[in-house]
Amino acid sequence: MLRKSYIFTFLKYTFKPKSQGEKMKKLIKFSLFAALAASFANAAVYEIDPAHSSVGFKIKHLSISKVSGNFGKFDAVIDYDKNAKELKTLEATIETASVNTQNEKRDEHLRSADFFNAAKFDKITYKMVKFEKESDTEGKVVGTLTMHGVTKPVVLKFELGGFTADKNGKEKIGFSLEGETKRKLFEIGLDTPEITLSDKVELEIEVEAKEK
């Protein structure tokens, strides 16, 4: 009993504020910690389901039609806060050599030094900097795209598809991302004139991910 009383006395002495200013500092620190803890508690981390996700693009050919393509190998870290209804983290990695336009000869050319130079720049990455919420299901992902050794800002339109549970009871999230960029910003295909291949590239991404 004496030992217990001593411990309580020690703790009381240790954490008892010595002044009103110190008391306020402790209160502010505690409030910040509580807010941070609540934020982490509400956010969920998801791992991407590649079988039900896609990273696609479209680019105009000869100024009259669009060629579609995609990257077959990719991964992402996704953190979504259901209470705040906003994306907290999005970091994606794409294997450059996995580019696929349904034409092997063209794909080999895209992997070459004329375009992506996949042997030297084997990864394409996208990292979210901030999320601008527009509604409970829509917003803008402001981030940076690193490709071909060049990093540029790219904004993607976010649209939440919704939530469900898989057969094992794990929660799944689905959302779409759309945006555009310019290949010449990343020094890709600089010798290819725009009359042959447009500078603008449309980005179309579909994500289905499972809670970890």
Predicted regions: what they are:
Residues K25-F33:
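Sec-dependent signal peptide recognition
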